[in-house]
Swiss-Prot record:
GO terms for biological process: fatty acid biosynthetic process; lipid A biosynthetic process. Pfam families: FabA (PF07977). Keywords: Cytoplasm, Lipid A biosynthesis, Lipid biosynthesis, Lipid metabolism, Lyase. The keyword Lipid metabolism applies. The active site is at residue 54. The keyword Electron transport does not apply. This is 3-hydroxyacyl-[acyl-carrier-protein] dehydratase FabZ. InterPro entries: FabA_FabZ, FabZ, HotDog_dom_sf. It is found in: Cytoplasm. Belongs to the thioester dehydratase family. FabZ subfamily. Involved in unsaturated fatty acids biosynthesis. Catalyzes the dehydration of short chain beta-hydroxyacyl-ACPs and long chain saturated and unsaturated beta-hydroxyacyl-ACPs. It comes from the Bacteria. Its EC number is 4.2.1.59. It comes from Idiomarina loihiensis (strain ATCC BAA-735 / DSM 15497 / L2-TR).
Amino acid sequence: MKITESGFDIQGVLDLLPHRYPFLLIDRVIETNSKDSLHAIKNVTFNEPMFNGHFPAKPIFPGVLLLEAIAQACGLLGFKITESKKNANDLYLFAGIDNARFKRQVIPGDTVDFFVTFEKERRGIWKFTGRAEVDGDVACTAEIICARREV
């Protein structure tokens, strides 16, 4: 049985990620295992700016933003694994994506659960697997590659 730690609210997310509105895509971390996994959520509302154009008559949360949210969750997990805090010059940069698949649409009113798992790290390159779910149904899966760098 893995020992888990409690999650943290939006202030904890803001303390670790450099992203801000409208590009901060994680609302809360539900649970972390500081060794290898994290569960976060995003509440999707009709007031999100992307729905002005994607698509006005039938709003659908863009799949590429689901991938970005998974990457943000991976960054949060990276900071938790290393037990470090964000500083102005330290970022997890999106370095690559493999095997991205979209299974269902995400629409206003949905709560998206993001589950990310650390796979390996080599020479500053981190690999994670992630999935987005709505009501237990998989919306998106991907392998995310990040590089922690001082910028």
